[in-house]
Amino acid sequence: EYLNLTGTRAACGQGVCRACTVIFDDAAGGARTAPACVTGAAWANGRTLRTIEGIAGRDPEGRVVPSAIQQAYLDHFSFQCSFCTPGFVMAATALVEELGRAPIPRAQLEDRIVAALNENICRCTGYIRYLEAVRAVILATPGLVIDVVATDARQG
């Protein structure tokens, strides 16, 4: 609160709802999400902490520009009250970054999106629009999924 970084929500206070999700980056280039409400400060030692305030960018005039995930959530009307949205943004951002480092076959995409967002709880709208928005960003971003062409072993 002293830094005016109030976007990370304190909801359940037990790490269950994931509204307080943040991203920790380590020196090796890896990243993982964690619920801020139950993650001790000592665990962050040697890691960089990213909160929802650090996800959007800025244009040359200094105006805030939503990230691809944030814009997709807006475009898909993914949220209603938006209390849980910071946690969903952080989870989806970590997923997109992970796929940028290690793309997956397209056939695994749905399961991977569900796994990434599965711990986040929304009490208003459900999850379909969140999932659709993340899918749209991933499929629109080159290099995140691999189209695997099945070959017939009987040929050639």
Enumerate the predicted regions with their spans.
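Signature of N-terminal electron-transfer/Fe-S-associated modules in redox systems
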Residues: E1-G156
